[in-house]
Amino acid sequence: KTKLGAFLDLETTGLNYLSAEIIEIALVPFRYSSDGRIFEVLEPFNQLQQPKKGLIPEEITKITGITNEMVNGQQIDVARLKEIVSQSSIIVAHNANFDRRFAEAEFDFFATKPWACSMSQIPWRDEGLEGGKLEYLAMKSGFYYDAHRASTDCYAGIELLTKNLQTSNKLTFNVLLEEARKETRRIWAERAPFDLKDILKERG
């Protein structure tokens, strides 16, 4: 029996989820088994959104290639997005700490789902790799892609999950699922003093 997972990637106007906005979302569903084998990649959900608070900063356009003209009048189909998320057993993101905050702040239905991070929850360094950046991992796994657009990042992430790790030879997605199944706790530091933000960030 297979389950449905979904790989998420966002492009945003900045790094702070309290002030920046989502300008592109990609969610690529895939079918997988409980031991981490991915059998099928399904039709992607990929949409742009015009920010409500002004224009896309120039430096963000340089990184993502997304212009104000491209997002003009665009809006995310929340009902369709919710449908995909509700059917998914797990949401995977590369650097989920970033994507999850934005996703849950804008769409509350993400908060009820289990999440997994393909960057922090796989021991890449133990597997002989120097870091967890997606482009680097893709290159080391033998494939290249056009980074910094949401849908291509998702496809690259899914491709990475289908590979065996270099040192242990374990299936990457199986390792991630085992890690994601461990019990975790989330702590919110709401209305913490501004001068404590760096300390809190360091502590995760």
Regions found by a protein language model. Give the residues of each.
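Extended, compositionally biased eukaryotic interaction scaffolds
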Residues: 119, 125-130, 140, 161-167
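Short, contiguous strand/loop micro-motifs
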Residues: 44-45, 68-69, 120-122, 183-184
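Conserved non-catalytic scaffold segment of RNase H-like nuclease domains
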Residues: 1-114, 127-148, 174
